[in-house]
C-alpha cells in the first residue's frame, strides 16, 4: 500500500508541475479580427503623374512624319517638349500601378495577405522599406508581367513614331523650305527648355485612367522574373493602394517607392541630348531630326528600359577603315649619261 500511495503522490506532483509550466508558457497569439477591406485609393499626385505620362505618350506618338512647312515643325517640337522629363519617368510607375490594379487576382492576393488594420499598415511599411517584398504576394508575378508588357508597348509605339519622324528629316530635304534656317533659334531653344521644366497638369481622372488600363491587351508574354525596378515599384504602389495606404496622407512613403534612379538618369540624358541638338540645329530638317531622335525615340527607349524588355536595336554608321595601299617601290635611279668627248 505504501508503494501505491507513493505512486499516486508522484502522479499528482507531475500533474501540478505541468499546470505550473503551462501557466508560465507564452500566450497563443490572438487571431486578427478581419475587417472590411478599404477602398482602393491613390493620392491625387499619383493620378496627375499617371495622366501626364498617358497624355505625353499619346500626344508624342501621334506626331506625324509629314511636314509641309517650318511652322508645322516648330509646333511638333513644342508639343514633344511640353513635359518635365522626371515627371515622365515617375508617370511610368504611376501608370504602371494603375495597370496592376486591373489584375483582380493580384488585388485579391493583397487583401488575403493582410486582413486587419494593423496587418495592412505593417505590410505597407514593409513595401515602403523594400518594394521587392511585393513579389511575395500571391498574384504579383502576373500583375508585374502585365505592367511590363503594357509599358513596353507604350515605349515601342513612341519609338516607332520617332523613327518615322527621323526618317522624314532626310526625305524632306528635297523641299526648299526645309533648308531655311529656323526662325528665332535662340528663342526656340529657350522655349523648349522652359516647357521641359514644367510639370504638366493632366485632365484625366482616375476613372479615365482605370478605364484606359482595363482596355489594354498587350501582345506577348508572360514576362518572367526578374522584373525591372520600375515594374516592381509599380506593383508595390498598387499593393499599397489596395491596402488603403497610398492616399494623400502617405505621400512620403509613396514618393520613396516611386524613385527609379536608372530611369531618372535615362530621362535626364534624353533632355540633355535634346537641348544640345536644338542648340546646334539650324535648318528645319535638323529640328525634325532632333524631334525624331531625341524627343521621341530616346524617350521611347527610356520607357522600354523601364519595362525591363529588350530595347530596340539601332544600327549606327561605323566607317570602314581600309588599309593604306602599299607604296609602289621607287624606280631605280638612272645612271647619268656618259659625257661625250
Which role fits each region the language model picked out?
Residues 1-6:
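N-terminal secretory signal peptides that target proteins for export/translocation
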Residues 7-8, 258:
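Hydrophobic alpha-helical segments, principally membrane-spanning helices and signal/leader peptides
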Residues 8, 12, 25-248, 322-334:
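Acidic/polar low-complexity scaffolding segments in large eukaryotic proteins
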Residues 15-18:
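Alpha-helical transmembrane segments
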Amino acid at each position: 500500500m505504501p508503494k501505491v500511495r507513493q505512486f499516486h503522490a508522484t502522479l499528482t506532483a507531475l500533474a501540478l508541475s505541468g499546470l505550473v509550466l503551462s501557466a508560465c508558457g507564452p500566450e497563443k497569439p490572438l487571431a486578427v479580427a478581419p475587417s472590411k477591406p478599404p477602398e482602393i485609393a491613390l493620392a491625387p499626385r499619383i493620378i496627375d503623374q499617371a495622366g501626364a505620362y498617358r497624355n505625353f505618350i499619346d500626344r508624342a506618338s501621334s506626331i506625324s512624319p509629314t511636314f509641309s512647312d517650318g511652322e508645322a515643325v516648330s509646333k511638333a517640337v513644342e508639343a514633344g517638349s511640353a513635359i518635365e522629363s522626371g515627371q515622365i519617368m515617375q508617370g511610368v510607375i504611376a501608370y504602371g500601378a494603375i495597370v496592376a490594379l486591373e489584375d483582380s487576382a493580384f488585388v485579391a492576393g493583397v487583401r488575403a495577405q493582410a486582413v486587419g488594420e494593423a496587418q495592412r499598415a505593417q505590410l505597407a511599411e514593409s513595401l515602403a522599406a523594400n518594394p521587392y517584398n511585393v513579389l511575395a504576394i500571391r498574384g504579383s508575378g502576373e500583375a508585374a508581367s502585365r505592367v511590363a508588357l503594357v509599358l513596353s508597348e507604350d515605349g515601342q509605339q513612341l519609338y516607332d513614331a520617332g523613327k518615322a519622324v527621323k526618317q522624314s528629316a532626310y526625305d524632306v530635304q528635297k523641299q526648299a523650305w526645309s533648308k531655311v534656317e529656323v526662325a528665332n533659334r535662340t528663342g526656340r531653344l529657350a522655349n523648349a527648355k522652359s516647357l521641359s521644366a514644367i510639370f504638366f497638369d493632366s485632365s484625366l481622372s482616375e476613372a479615365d485612367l482605370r478605364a484606359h488600363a482595363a482596355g489594354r491587351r498587350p501582345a506577348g508574354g508572360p514576362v518572367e522574373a526578374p522584373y525591372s525596378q520600375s515594374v516592381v515599384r509599380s506593383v508595390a504602389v498598387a499593393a499599397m493602394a489596395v491596402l488603403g495606404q497610398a492616399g494623400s496622407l502617405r505621400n512620403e512613403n509613396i514618393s520613396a517607392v516611386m524613385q527609379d534612379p536608372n530611369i531618372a538618369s535615362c530621362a535626364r540624358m534624353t533632355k540633355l541630348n535634346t537641348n544640345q541638338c536644338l542648340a546646334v540645329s539650324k535648318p528645319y530638317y535638323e529640328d525634325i531630326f532632333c524631334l525624331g531622335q531625341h524627343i521621341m525615340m530616346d524617350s521611347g527607349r527610356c520607357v522600354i528600359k523601364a519595362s525591363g524588355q529588350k530595347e530596340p536595336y539601332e544600327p549606327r554608321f561605323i566607317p570602314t577603315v581600309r588599309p593604306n595601299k602599299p607604296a609602289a617601290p621607287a624606280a631605280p635611279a638612272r645612271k647619268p649619261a656618259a659625257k661625250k668627248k
